[in-house]
C-alpha cells in the first residue's frame, strides 16, 4: 500500500517582512503591527509599570529590549576584548620609485656631507647674453672634471673674559703622615687680563693631630652591648675570682685551663651523658663565657660578661639555653657627705674715737679669767714718810692671754692701779728721805678682740694658754 505523500508546508514570512509590505497597503494581520511597534499588552504593562518602579538601569520594563547598558551577550561566547598593542608613532616612510635606468645594487652607506666653516666664497656674476640661449648636445661619456681653487680662510678669535676658564689650582703635593710639614698650592693662570694676587692656604699639623690621607668612611655609631634586654637574665656575682679566674666558678681545677687569657671568650665542653656540677650554682650549664666589658653605672664601675647556657640539646645537635648577664661591681660611688660649716668670727673690728675708761675695760677683761687669778696673792706694807712718797717692793701676779686658735690683734690696754693704804710709820728712819720708786711691768702689752667683750663668764674649758709674769719695783 502506497503512502500518500503530504504536501510541502510553505514557510510564512517573518513579522518584520510582512510589516514592510503590508503597512503601506493596510492589509497587515492584527498581530503584526503591535508586535513590530512594541504595543502588545505585555509591553504596555511593562512600559507603564516602569514609570513607578526603578530597576537600576537593568533594562527591565523599558520596552527597548536592549538588555540594559551592557546589552545582551549570546550564550557560549566571550565578550570582545581589546587586543591592540600601543606603539609609538613613527614617521611615515617615503618610498622612491625605481626607474628602469637605475642600478640594481643599492648602496647601504649613506653619503657624508661636509660643511666647510669659514668665510663664504664669492660667486662671480655672469652678465646676461643678449643673443639668446645656445643649446649644445654631446654624446661624450667622459665624466666632467671641475677645477675648484682652494680658498684661503682667515679665522680671528677673541677671548671673552666671561667664558674664559677660571684659574686652575695644582693639587697639593703628597706628604707623609708624620712630623711637621706644610702644604701650599701655587696658582696657574690661563687668562690675559689683570692678575690679582691670591692668598696661599697653609695647613700645618703636628704629630699629635696627624690625619691619614686615606678617605675615612662614615663613622658608625657604637653598637649597644644589649646587657639589659628583656631576654637576658641578670645575675650578680660576689666572688672576686670572677674578674681574675672565672674558670674556677664554672669547673673545678683543671690543668687544661691554667694560663688561659681571661680577656677572650671562654668555651667549656659539655657531656650529655653526665651531669656537670659547677662550683658556683649560678654558673651551672655554662658552655660559653664571652669577653668582658667595663661599663659605667650611677653606682660605680661594673665588670660584665655574657654567658650562654646549654640547658637542653635536641637530637639534631641544636643547643637550647638561656642568655645570662654576669656582673661584678668593682667600686661604689657613695653619696657626697654634707659637712656643716661653722661661722668664723670676723677678724675686722671698728675702732671708736673716744677712749674707754679703765674700769669698764678691766671689768670685761677679768670676766673671762678664773677666780684664783683675780685676787692678789700677797700685799706687803711699805714704810712711808709724811711727804707723800711711797717706797717698797710689791710682788704681784697677773695673767696675760697669748695667741690661741685665732689671730688676736693687739690693742693698747689700760693701766693696772695698785691700791695701798697709807700707814703711820712705827719707826722714823735716820735718813731724812728715800728716793721714789717706779713700777715696771716685765711683760708686753696685748690687745683683746672686740668680739670677746660680749662673752659670758665661763669657768674651765678655756681655749687659751696662761703664763705668769712678775712685777718688779
UniProtKB/Swiss-Prot annotation:
GO terms for biological process: microtubule-dependent intracellular transport of viral material towards nucleus; symbiont entry into host cell; viral penetration into host nucleus. Disulfide bonds join 22-28. It holds the Pfam family Late_protein_L2. Highly phosphorylated. It is found in: Virion; Host nucleus; Host early endosome; Host Golgi apparatus. Belongs to the papillomaviridae L2 protein family. HPV16, in comparison to HPV types 6 and 11, is more often associated with malignant genital cancers in humans. Interacts with major capsid protein L1. Interacts with E2; this interaction inhibits E2 transcriptional activity but not the DNA replication function E2. Interacts with host GADD45GIP1. Interacts with host HSPA8; this interaction is required for L2 nuclear translocation. Interacts with host importins KPNB2 and KPNB3. Forms a complex with importin alpha2-beta1 heterodimers via interaction with the importin alpha2 adapter. Interacts with host DYNLT1; this interaction is essential for virus intracellular transport during entry. Minor protein of the capsid that localizes along the inner surface of the virion, within the central cavities beneath the L1 pentamers. Plays a role in capsid stabilization through interaction with the major capsid protein L1. Once the virion enters the host cell, L2 escorts the genomic DNA into the nucleus by promoting escape from the endosomal compartments and traffic through the host Golgi network. This is Minor capsid protein L2. It comes from Human papillomavirus type 16.
Amino acid at each position: 500500500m502506497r503512502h500518500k505523500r503530504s504536501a510541502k508546508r510553505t514557510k510564512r514570512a517573518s513579522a518584520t517582512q510582512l510589516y514592510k509590505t503590508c503597512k503601506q497597503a493596510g492589509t497587515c494581520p492584527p498581530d503584526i503591527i503591535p508586535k513590530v511597534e512594541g504595543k502588545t499588552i505585555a509591553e504596555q504593562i511593562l512600559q507603564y509599570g516602569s514609570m513607578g518602579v526603578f530597576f537600576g538601569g537593568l533594562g527591565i520594563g523599558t520596552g527597548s529590549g536592549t538588555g540594559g547598558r551592557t546589552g545582551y551577550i549570546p550564550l557560549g561566547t566571550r565578550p570582545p576584548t581589546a587586543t591592540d598593542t600601543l606603539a609609538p608613532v613613527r614617521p611615515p616612510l617615503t618610498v622612491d620609485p625605481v626607474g628602469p635606468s637605475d642600478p640594481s645594487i643599492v648602496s647601504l652607506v649613506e653619503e657624508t656631507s661636509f660643511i666647510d666653516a669659514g668665510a663664504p666664497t664669492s660667486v662671480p656674476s655672469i652678465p646676461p647674453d643678449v643673443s639668446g640661449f645656445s643649446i649644445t648636445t654631446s654624446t661624450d661619456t667622459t665624466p666632467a672634471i671641475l677645477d675648484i681653487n682652494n680658498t684661503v680662510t682667515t679665522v680671528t678669535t677673541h677671548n671673552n673674559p666671561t667664558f674664559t676658564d677660571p684659574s686652575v689650582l695644582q693639587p697639593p703635593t703628597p706628604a707623609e703622615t708624620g712630623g711637621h710639614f706644610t702644604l701650599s698650592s701655587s696658582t696657574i693662570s690661563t687668562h690675559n687680563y689683570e692678575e690679582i694676587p691670591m692668598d696661599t692656604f697653609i695647613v700645618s699639623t703636628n704629630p699629635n693631630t696627624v690625619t691619614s690621607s686615606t678617605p675615612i668612611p662614615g663613622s658608625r655609631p657604637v653598637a649597644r652591648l644589649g646587657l639589659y634586654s628583656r631576654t637576658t637574665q641578670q645575675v650578680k656575682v660576689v666572688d672576686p675570682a670572677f674578674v681574675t679566674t672565672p674558670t674556677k666558678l664554672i669547673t673545678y681545677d683543671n690543668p687544661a685551663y691554667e694560663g688561659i687569657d681571661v680577656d677572650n671568650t671562654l668555651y667549656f665542653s659539655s657531656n650529655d651523658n653526665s651531669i656537670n656540677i659547677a662550683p658556683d650554682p649560678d654558673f651551672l650549664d655554662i658552655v660559653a663565657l664571652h669577653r668582658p666589658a667595663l661599663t659605667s653605672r650611677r653606682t660605680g664601675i661594673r665588670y660584665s660578661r655574657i654567658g650562654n647556657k646549654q640547658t637542653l640539646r635536641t637530637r639534631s645537635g641544636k643547643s637550647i639555653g638561656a642568655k645570662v648577664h654576669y656582673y661584678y661591681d668593682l667600686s661604689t660611688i657613695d653619696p657626697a657627705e654634707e659637712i656643716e660649716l661653722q661661722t668664723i668670727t670676723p677678724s675686722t673690728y671698728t675702732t671708736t674715737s673716744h677712749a674707754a675708761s679703765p674700769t669698764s675695760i678691766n671689768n670685761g677683761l677679768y670676766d673671762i679669767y678664773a677666780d684664783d687669778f683675780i685676787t692678789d696673792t700677797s700685799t706687803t706694807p711699805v714704810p712711808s714718810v709724811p711727804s707723800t712718797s711711797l717706797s717698797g717692793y710689791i710682788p704681784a701676779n697677773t695673767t696675760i692671754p697669748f695667741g690661741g686658735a685665732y689671730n688676736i690683734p693687739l690693742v693698747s690696754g689700760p693701766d693696772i692701779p695698785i691700791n695701798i693704804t697709807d700707814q703711820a710709820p712705827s719707826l722714823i728712819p735716820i735718813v731724812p728721805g728715800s728716793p721714789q720708786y717706779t713700777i715696771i711691768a716685765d711683760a708686753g702689752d696685748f690687745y683683746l678682740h672686740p668680739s670677746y667683750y660680749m662673752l659670758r663668764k665661763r669657768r674651765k674649758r678655756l681655749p687659751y694658754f696662761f703664763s705668769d709674769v712678775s712685777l718688779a719695783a
